[in-house]
Amino acid sequence: MNFYARTTAVVLLGIFINQPIWAQTFKMSCELEGVIPALEDRKLKPEKVVVEIQTMGKNLFMKVVGTNFYTVQASSLTTEEFIGKNLTSEKLMGVTRKHKATGFESEVRIERETVMMTAFNDMDYRGKTVRVLLSGPCIRP
């Protein structure tokens, strides 16, 4: 093998080895209703959202994709910023995380049998920490 062929092979091998490995994302639609108990049980307009579920190694990642109040992200991964925990059991799949600096928590749970989702997300609302509670049925794809 000449120098050019070896160099090309090494460069191509390096490109393929350094590509990030992404887990396949499972998506599911849900019809959620939200409430903010700290604001006199203020009800939010119901919304259709998409729940994205991924696993990477032993970690579970769940993300509710919707508008401002209907966006929740949690994972079992523990990092410098977050403490994560896998809540998955025979009855449900879920994760929770807590931001170390702010104490804000978020959680997503989906009941296996009924495919009902419950979630919450702490957020700052006009200088006050409030918890947005979400719940509703999901549709299996």
Which residues make up each language-model segment?
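Short, solvent-exposed aromatic-acidic interface loops
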Residues: 34-37, 63-73, 122-126
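Contiguous, well-ordered beta-strand patches that form the walls/edges
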Residues: 65-104, 137
